[in-house]
């Protein structure tokens, strides 16, 4: 897709031009006065634009030639207020965009009027774009650095061939550490959140060093608590790290802090535990080198009264005194703190430093754990959702990054469901995939037993940490529950487990309650209901991977079933490579389903009542379709593409509506098939659809919305698809497959649902993506559309024996029949909306409340 934008006629500032000299030796130079280039060597478009700006007195020009350039980096930073700003502005994040014309690279400043292209992930790395207006501005805090400003741009498609070998025209742009083009900040931020350390200012090479304690005076924490108010100089502290928080970025435009970071450490000695706050420039120097369990010697610190509203984490040992009256502060200066990591081999027993006590919980124990209880878990990742974002505060530019994961530990049929927020460990958060052994600490239990389905999941806290590699040698490996998990893993085979692994896609968790009144009391928003006339703005205001849940009122007037297309049911990438000369299993399954379902070619007319009666009759109560309802339901049973899917009660060879249709259409064999579809539309819709003032079309299902069967050999590609867009271009490994090459973990296809506003003036088309499984006696009866449109979990299991599921067409018939029963009924629809980037938005119907369950 492409995006086009451009607001200002001139750049943000105008100043005399004094560009660094871009010599034509493909090496770049550090500075000087620009010179006209000779005719030798390849001609650089960037060079020509700079020469054109030099000749323009307004310093804002339209290039004489507009050619595509490649985007190699999009980097974000906070720009402080200008001196003329008397009223502090909200955070204004700026973007530097590195482009290449094939001859040179150039780091450019993106005019803030174009920031929305980054917010929507339209301007991103790897694409070609055409810059149609540029200007010049200077960083007045640095000598002789003229900056090329992008004022108008047209974003194109992803480039097929990208080279990273072209040099920077200006050598200053490749100096380390990287610095933003404007302002006084020394570093870039992560592109999509403020919690992750990003860039080369974050050091990782701090090593333990032996220390001679003969001349070191050490004070205990309890003694320091009693005497700190009467001291000017504090003796050293010898402590062990028990908890480490994620980073907090507190930068604001009106604050002049160079590196405004903060992190908390909970440390302890034999006398107590206390909070340690690491400030500012110490965070980039030390944060990534410090880990839970290390022993530290702290010298030249400061002490202050503790912040009264901060809640300290639960102590790892309840016998240790919790010191909450003071805090230890570590700074680069005033005074300059000295931190030493003590090697574990030098730690003496007489120091009596506390050991780490993990609180590992098994999945079978989770059902009985109270809300807000803190625990650690270990298990096998069986589902890894896409990275999503939620806004921290309305009308702000700050977001949380999170993803949903499922962890199995062998103690229950149910997995742990974990809401995993970024823990300032991007090297792990962005590289998790199914089949990995996963440890997460300091998780909090979230539960609600008073709603249907019951709510039970875990969420990360400020002190949570994740581990995915390097488990050997970690203190938790000696825990009995960890050893039991390792024993369980040894009984599993990789090939047997892989077929049940799922990655990515739309994941509508947590489920909403069974009544609208409970839903109303469970959410915290200013306006409970969104007018259907406001839905378009709600959707357009979403930023990249931002997911929201809104409620609208309306009337369901039409529904249409869309089976899996050939694209979404194609063979997996590895099967395509291995079985190029023979039909794939999924292809065989498609043929079987098409034959069973009668190759319907003439489905534009509404489904008639005979179809509903036949479908309803053939679905016995004991094998009714059930939509999975939250964590207390059985794992989803997804029929394998090659397996026989048969409606109970229909014997092979028995005439059915499907077989009758197949016979009717047999003479059409060899002709192009239309997409099979079943639909219904109400008389009200026929009367109103041509007189609407607006009809919103948001029912398209994109490949990114489909959860996929995980293939270990393509883990890097699949992980990249469901991670956030990177800030810097990374070349793919070999020839990457396409997302549609991987099998869908859903077996039913989807529905297009039309909801007409209560005033009959505006309608919206949305998608509904159910997944079904055999009846679960632990969940309530699900016989109507009202209860089936709820949370569907991507956790597939094989069907065995007599547990075969009815075919997708039978399920679709049941759902469409339920829709007809809502004709002219006022409902409340819960919509999940998410911006997928690049002008793609998903709008999915999560649940509908009828008048019976709105009270």
From Swiss-Prot:
Report the GO terms under cellular component: nuclear speck; replication fork
* Impact upon substituting residue 310 to E: Decreased binding to single-stranded DNA
Q: Which Pfam families match?
A: RADX (PF17659)
- Which terms does the UniProt entry file under GO BP? negative regulation of double-strand break repair via homologous recombination; regulation of DNA repair
Main localization, broad class:
nucleus
- GO MF annotation, one: single-stranded DNA binding
The impact of changing residue 240 to E is: Decreased binding to single-stranded DNA
Keyword DNA-binding in record: yes
Q: Show the ranges annotated as biased composition (Polar residues).
A: 577-588
Determine the domain of life of the protein's source: Eukaryota
Subcellular localization(s) per the UniProt record: Chromosome
Classification via InterPro entries: NA-bd_OB-fold (IPR012340), RADX (IPR040893)
Q: What is the effect of changing residue 327 to A?
A: Decreased binding to single-stranded DNA
Primary role = Single-stranded DNA-binding protein recruited to replication forks to maintain genome stability. Prevents fork collapse by antagonizing the accumulation of RAD51 at forks to ensure the proper balance of fork remodeling and protection without interfering with the capacity of cells to complete homologous recombination of double-strand breaks.
Protein name per its UniProtKB record: RPA-related protein RADX
Organism (species): Homo sapiens
Q: What is the lineage of its organism?
A: Eukaryota, Metazoa, Chordata, Craniata, Vertebrata
């Amino acid at each position: 897709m492409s995006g086009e934008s451009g607001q200002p006629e001139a750049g943000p500032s105008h100043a005399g031009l004094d560009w660094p000299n871009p010599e034509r030796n493909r090496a770049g130079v550090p500075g000087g006065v620009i010179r006209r280039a000779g005719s030798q060597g390849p001609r650089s478009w960037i060079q020509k634009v700079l020469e054109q700006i030099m000749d323009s007195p307004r310093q804002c020009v339209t290039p004489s030639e507009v050619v595509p350039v490649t985007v190699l980096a999009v980097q974000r930073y906070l720009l402080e207020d200008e001196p003329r700003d008397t009223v502090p502005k909200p955070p204004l994040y700026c973007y530097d965009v590195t482009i290449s014309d094939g001859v040179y690279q150039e780091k450019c400043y993106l005019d803030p009027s174009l920031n929305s292209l980054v917010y929507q992930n339209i301007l991103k790395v790897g694409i070609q774009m055409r810059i149609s207006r540029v200007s010049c501005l200077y960083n007045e805090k640095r000598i002789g650095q003229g900056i090329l400003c992008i004022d108008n741009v047209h974003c194109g498609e992803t480039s097929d061939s990208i080279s990273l070998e072209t040099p920077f025209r200006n050598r200053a742009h490749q100096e380390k550490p990287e610095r933003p083009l404007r302002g006084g900040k020394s570093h870039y931020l992560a592109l999509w959140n403020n919690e992750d350390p990003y860039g080369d200012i974050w050091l990782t090479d701090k090593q333990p060093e032996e220390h001679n304690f003969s001349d070191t005076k050490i004070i205990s924490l309890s003694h320091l608590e009693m005497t700190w108010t009467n001291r000017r100089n504090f003796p050293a502290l010898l402590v062990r790290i028990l908890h480490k928080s994620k980073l907090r970025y507190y930068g604001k435009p009106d604050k002049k802090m160079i590196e405004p970071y903060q992190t908390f450490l909970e440390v302890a000695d034999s006398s107590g535990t206390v909070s340690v706050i690491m400030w500012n420039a110490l965070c980039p120097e030390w944060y990534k080198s410090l880990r839970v369990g290390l022993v530290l010697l702290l010298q030249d610190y400061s002490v202050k009264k503790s912040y009264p509203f901060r809640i300290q984490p639960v102590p790892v040992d309840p016998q240790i005194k919790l010191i909450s009256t003071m805090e230890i502060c570590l700074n680069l200066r005033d005074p300059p703190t000295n931190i030493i990591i003590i090697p574990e081999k030098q730690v003496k027993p007489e120091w009596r430093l506390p050991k780490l006590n993990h609180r590992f919980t098994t999945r079978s124990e989770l059902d009985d754990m109270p809300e807000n209880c803190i625990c650690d878990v270990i298990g096998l990742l069986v589902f890894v959702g896409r990275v999503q974002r939620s806004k921290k505060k309305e009308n702000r530019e700050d977001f949380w990054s999170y993803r949903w994961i499922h962890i199995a530990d062998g103690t229950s049929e149910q997995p742990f469901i974990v809401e995993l927020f970024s823990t300032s460990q991007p090297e792990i958060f962005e590289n998790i995939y199914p089949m990995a052994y996963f440890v997460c600490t300091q998780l909090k239990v979230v539960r609600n037993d008073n709603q249907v389905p019951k709510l039970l999941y875990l969420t990360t806290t400020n002190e949570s940490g994740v581990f995915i590699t390097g488990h050997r040698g970690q203190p938790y490996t000696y825990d009995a529950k960890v050893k039991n998990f390792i024993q369980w893993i040894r009984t599993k085979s990789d090939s047997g487990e892989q077929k049940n692994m799922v990655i990515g896609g739309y994941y509508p968790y947590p489920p909403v309650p069974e009544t609208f009144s409970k839903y109303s009391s469970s959410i915290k928003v200013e306006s409970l209901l969104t007018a259907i006339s406001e839905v378009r703005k709600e959707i357009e205001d979403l930023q990249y991977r931002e997911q929201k849940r809104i409620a609208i009122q309306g009337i369901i007037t039409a529904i249409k079933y869309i089976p899996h297309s050939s694209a979404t049911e194609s063979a997996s990438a590895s099967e395509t490579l291995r079985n190029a000369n023979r039909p794939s299993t999924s292809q065989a399954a498609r043929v079987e389903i098409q034959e069973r379902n009668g190759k319907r070619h003439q489905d534009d007319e509404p489904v008639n009542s005979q179809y509903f009666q036949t479908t309803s009759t053939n679905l016995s109560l004991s094998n009714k379709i059930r939509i999975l309802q939250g964590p207390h339901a059985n794992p989803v049973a997804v029929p394998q593409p090659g397996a026989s899917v048969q409606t109970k009660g229909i014997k092979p060879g028995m005439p059915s509506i499907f077989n009758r249709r197949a016979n009717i259409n047999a003479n059409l064999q060899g002709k192009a098939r239309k997409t099979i579809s079943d639909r219904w539309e109400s008389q009200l819709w026929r009367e109103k659809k041509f007189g609407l003032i607006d009809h919103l079309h948001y029912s398209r299902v994109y490949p990114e919305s489909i959860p996929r069967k995980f293939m270990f050999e393509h883990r890097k590609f699949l992980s990249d698809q469901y991670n956030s867009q990177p800030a810097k271009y990374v070349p793919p490994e070999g020839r990457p497959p396409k997302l549609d090459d991987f099998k869908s973990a859903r077996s039913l296809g989807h529905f297009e649902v039309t909801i007409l506003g209560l005033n009959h003036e505006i309608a919206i088309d949305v998608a509904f993506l159910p997944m079904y499984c055999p009846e679960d006696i632990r969940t309530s009866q699900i016989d109507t559309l009202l209860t089936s449109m709820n949370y569907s979990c991507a956790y597939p299991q094989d069907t065995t024996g007599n547990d075969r599921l009815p075919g997708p067409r039978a399920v679709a018939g049941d759902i469409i029949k339920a829709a007809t029963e809502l004709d002219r009924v006022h409902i409340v629809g819960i919509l999940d909306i998410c911006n997928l980037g690049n002008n793609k938005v998903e709008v999915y119907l999560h649940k509908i409340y009828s008048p019976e369950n709105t009270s």
